[in-house]
Amino acid sequence: MIHGSAIVSPKAKIGENVNIGHFTVIHDNVIIGNNTTIEGYCEIGYPTPLALNQPLVIGNDSYIRSHSIFYAGSTFKDKLITGHRVTVREKTYAGNNLQIGTLSDVQGDCNIGDYVRAHSNVHIGKHSKIGNYIWIFPFVVLTNDPHPPSETMLGVTIKDYSIIATMSVLLPGVTVNELSLVGAHSLVKDDVETGTVVAGSPAKMICETSSVKLREHPELSAYPWPKHFDRGYPDVVINQWRKTFGEKII
């Protein structure tokens, strides 16, 4: 259902069973997949020359909450979910089931994998590369300018299964390798090795992630986290984790 106050361009391609809320604007160069909901006061496909005439593509079964703005020129696969007042700039390419929390900002020219979870108030700078099954907690900032202000852009890379805890800042060009954990309030200026915990300002290696124990089961390692946490993930993913990481420990 399209609310009577919504403005939907006749050039936009709207799938089946799509709900568009009050006072939302859908611009020309937009493709919206089936069974998608866009709440009120959103602006979808905001025009910009930086999009190079490419459309905004929103996959099937997505849910965009109110007051969010998506620029033209980005592509999101199925089951995109946002909080309120999210801004996503052009040339952002994301896989399945990206979740972007309230008041988060994706600055564009980004590549984001499958099942990425970005909580509220996350800033993802231009040229960021984010892998699969990443968790980014509130107030994290991914930077890109090594000597601001300048024309140099060095995006941050976060590889599969890594976690960036709340209020951390990743400096330009940093790579966080697979299965790693960045502790809360960290300032990361150097690459993070695979399967390690770093924390502090500047961040230093603390230990291997396997040394971190579950609070309620101190005899068990908390990492890799798919061995004990799978809430919200589909069976096909969980079954693959069982093959990769072994049976669930709790």
What are these regions (language model features)?
Residues 3-4, 9-10, 15-16, 21-22, ...:
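Left-handed beta-helix
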Residues 48-49, 146-148, 174, 208-209:
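Conserved catalytic-core motifs of eukaryotic protein kinase domains, centered on the activation segment
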Residues 60-61, 160-163, 215-219, 224-227:
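Short, low-complexity, polar/charged sequence segments that are solvent-exposed and flexible
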Residues 138-145, 213-220:
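Short glycine/proline- and charge-enriched loop/turn segments
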Residues 194-219:
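Conserved beta-strand-loop-alpha-helix hinge in the C-terminal portion
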Residues 219-250:
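Intrinsic low-complexity, glycine/proline- and repeat-rich
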